[in-house]
């Protein structure tokens, strides 16, 4: 597939089971006020006006359902056994004579992410940063603890941030990070894509996140999302 220079492709890993949410279906397929989380996430990306193509990775037995839900809005691929493998599989569709300039990776569970946040990440990429993540300052005090629950220390909160998605990268950097990082450590040890970039020595730039880009993981998160959607 030939792609134009400067194109932005967004990958949405949505192959997880969402066991903590316990809604009886994979989390991405849960309907929030009549619309699935995956549909809301994809629409937010496209509504930003800065994303050209969306690739969604879903459980292998849900590909037909995903195509029916999303139609022409996204390419559908089967995901893997964990998040890192799923993104890796989605990256394979980017092979061709011309790769996109930038790749975003966005959690389907962050279904209410404002389009303006997506645009902010891409703007930073176009400004010359090779890896960009949206973040929010922490309001809670954080404790480091050992396996026995003993507090080891209290990190300085002023220097800590909660990371959101979409996370954006130059395509070459993300591909190199996955190729090398996945060989060095088990996939389960990487909780986000920026961690892979950090692992190979890449620099990651932060931009302002948005409270609406919270991850719907628990029943409490779901209640909050429902309240927001219903106004």
Swiss-Prot record:
Keywords: Isoprene biosynthesis, Nucleotidyltransferase, Transferase. It catalyses: 2-C-methyl-D-erythritol 4-phosphate + CTP + H(+) = 4-CDP-2-C-methyl-D-erythritol + diphosphate. It comes from the Bacteria. Pathway: Isoprenoid biosynthesis; isopentenyl diphosphate biosynthesis via DXP pathway; isopentenyl diphosphate from 1-deoxy-D-xylulose 5-phosphate: step 2/6. GO terms for cellular component: plasma membrane. One of its GO terms (molecular function) is CTP binding. The record marks 20, 27 as: Transition state stabilizer. InterPro entries: IspD, IspD/TarI, IspD/TarI_cytidylyltransf_bact, ISPD_synthase_CS, Nucleotide-diphossugar_trans. GO terms for biological process: isopentenyl diphosphate biosynthetic process, methylerythritol 4-phosphate pathway involved in terpenoid biosynthetic process. Its EC number is 2.7.7.60. The keyword Nucleotidyltransferase applies. The record marks 157, 215 as: Positions MEP for the nucleophilic attack. SUPFAM superfamilies: Nucleotide-diphospho-sugar transferases. It holds the Pfam family IspD. Catalyzes the formation of 4-diphosphocytidyl-2-C-methyl-D-erythritol from CTP and 2-C-methyl-D-erythritol 4-phosphate (MEP). Was identified as a high-confidence drug target. PANTHER family: 2-C-METHYL-D-ERYTHRITOL 4-PHOSPHATE CYTIDYLYLTRANSFERASE, CHLOROPLASTIC. Belongs to the IspD/TarI cytidylyltransferase family. IspD subfamily. This is 2-C-methyl-D-erythritol 4-phosphate cytidylyltransferase. It comes from Mycobacterium tuberculosis (strain ATCC 25618 / H37Rv).
């Amino acid at each position: 597939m030939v792609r134009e220079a400067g194109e932005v492709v967004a990958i949405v890993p949505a192959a997880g089971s969402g066991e903590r949410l316990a809604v009886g279906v994979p989390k991405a397929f849960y309907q929030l006020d009549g619309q699935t989380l995956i549909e809301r996430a994809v629409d937010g990306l496209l509504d930003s006006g800065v994303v050209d193509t969306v690739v969604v990775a879903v459980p292998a037995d849900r590909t037909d359902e995903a195509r029916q839900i999303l139609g022409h809005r996204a390419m559908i691929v089967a995901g893997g056994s964990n998040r890192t493998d799923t993104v890796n599989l989605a990256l394979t569709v980017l092979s061709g004579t011309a790769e996109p300039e930038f790749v975003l990776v966005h959690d389907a569970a962050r279904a209410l992410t404002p389009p303006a946040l997506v645009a902010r990440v891409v703007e930073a990429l176009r400004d010359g940063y090779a890896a960009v993540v949206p973040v929010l300052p922490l309001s809670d005090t954080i404790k480091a603890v050992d396996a026995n629950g003993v507090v080891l220390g209290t990190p300085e909160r002023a220097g800590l941030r909660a990371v959101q998605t979409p996370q954006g990268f130059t395509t070459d950097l993300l591909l190199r990070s996955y190729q090398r990082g996945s060989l060095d450590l088990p996939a389960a040890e990487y909780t986000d894509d920026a961690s892979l970039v950090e692992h190979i020595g890449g620099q990651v730039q932060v931009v302002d996140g948005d409270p609406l880009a919270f991850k719907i993981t628990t029943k409490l998160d779901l209640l909050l999302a429902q309240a927001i959607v219903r106004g």
